[in-house]
Regions:
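Short beta-strand/loop segment that forms part of the nucleotide-sugar
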Residues: 35-43, 63-66
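Active-site-proximal specificity loops/subdomain of glycosyltransferases
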Residues: 47-98
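Short, acidic, metal-binding catalytic loop of nucleotide-sugar glycosyltransferases
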Residues: 27-36
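Cell-envelope/extracellular polymer assembly enzymes that use nucleotide-activated donors
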Residues: 8-10
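Short acidic donor-binding/metal-coordinating loop in glycosyltransferase active sites
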Residues: 42, 100-104, 109
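Boundary detector for helix-to-coil junctions that initiate low-complexity/charged tails
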Residues: 300-349
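Active-site beta-to-alpha loop of glycosyltransferases that engages the nucleotide-sugar donor
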Residues: 13-27, 43
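Catalytic-site signature of metal-activated, phosphate-bearing donor transferases
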Residues: 75-80, 107-310
Length: 349
């Protein structure tokens, strides 16, 4: 099957309450070779355009407020958004990836996405497994870059994936995690093998997705008030009700994030700390439409030696159980406050 010869890549994302993190996500994926970003602004309180500054040349912002299911029975906001993007200018690029702002594509053997994707001839979609990161013991969001601060994750990859798909091969989008392909196109994993959900040794050695789903304990608990782009309260499946209930959200944190998501130190992304901060500093120098935005100073850059980062001493002091022990104390305090509030509410009924 004859395919497009270039390897241009665009990324599509829904953005809500990501003012502290979106620039890092943009710069990092720009360094990987993403040509353009289509950002769907789902935050009416803080317009995304006020945050972007020098990103405007390679970012298209689409205002995207409202009910996630209005007019789309059975479809969530992500599917509606991605379908809209692919029906528009995203289709002019060879490849498209649908990501969340807490998901970072990681290439272990290639410098750029075009280099990586050039080896996938006659392939319609490449599915990359998640590596799920924990909170590293942070109660509040860490200062600086997410990719530098959060270095602890589950030891095993997640079977869940996100896809990079050829725009000409996509038939429809039925999930936020993959695309349905037209007849004749095939889906592979990062190693070029026919895609299968089962894990095997080396499945993420070439490429994967770092999923920073829990930047801190407070950010995790804030999911309840922020809402979820995948569901509303009337349609959320039973297994996902924790996303919309504070008590269940706390329990989910205790049983999954604090226990399982801080098992292994993975500091691969530290090698990008200097390039990311350098680009952020340069973008700050070119000005921003919001004078209140913080500036990134080159003086704060970390040093690197032959591509291997010099890890600050504070990171070396993390021992395997520290994140879990710190979380335990903070969670108990938060749980006590939650129980007291529930008791007061019941007493007032």
């Amino acid at each position: 099957m004859k395919t497009k010869t270039d390897c241009s890549v665009c990324a599509v994302a829904i953005v809500k309450e990501e003012d502290r993190f979106i620039e890092e996500w943009l710069v990092y994926h720009r360094l990987l070779g993403v040509s353009h970003f289509f950002l769907y602004d789902n935050d009416p309180k803080l317009p995304l355009r006020s945050l972007l500054g020098a990103s405007a040349s390679f970012v298209t912002v689409i205002d995207w407020p409202g009910d996630p299911t209005a007019g789309w029975p059975g479809r969530n906001l992500q599917i509606k958004t991605y379908t809209h993007a692919l029906a528009g200018k995203a289709a002019s690029y060879t490849w498209v990836t649908f990501l969340d702002p807490d998901e970072f594509i990681v290439l272990r053997k290639h410098d750029t996405l075009p280099d990586f994707l050039s080896s996938f001839e006659n392939v319609g979609s490449v599915r990359l497994n998640w590596h799920v990161f924990g909170h590293n013991g942070y109660y509040e969001d860490p200062q600086g870059l997410v990719t530098a601060a959060l270095t602890r994750r589950m030891a095993a990859p997640s079977p869940r994936t996100k896809a990079i798909s050829r725009t000409e091969a996509v038939s429809s989008i039925d999930s936020a995690h993959y695309c349905r392909l037209k007849r004749g196109w095939r889906t592979v994993d990062a190693n070029g093998r026919p895609y299968a959900e089962a894990l095997y040794p080396g499945k993420t050695e070439r490429a994967h997705i770092n999923h920073y789903q829990c930047r801190s304990f407070l950010t995790w608990m804030g999911r309840v008030t922020r809402g979820d782009v995948s569901f509303d309260r009337s349609t959320v499946p039973a297994d996902d009700r924790w996303r919309l209930d504070e008590h269940l959200c706390l329990r989910q944190f205790v049983e999954t994030v604090a226990r399982d998501k801080n098992e292994l130190v993975d500091d691969y992304m530290l090698r990008f700390e200097t390039p990311i901060l350098t680009h952020l500093a340069a973008r700050s120098d070119r000005g921003s439409p919001d004078p209140g935005r913080p500036r990134w100073e080159p003086a704060n850059l970390s040093s690197t030696i032959h591509g291997s980062p010099t890890i600050p001493e504070r990171r070396r002091r993390w021992l395997p159980g520290v994140a879990g022990r710190l979380s335990d104390g903070l969670i108990r305090l938060h749980g006590w406050r939650l129980r007291r509030r529930l008791q007061r509410n019941r007493a007032g009924e």
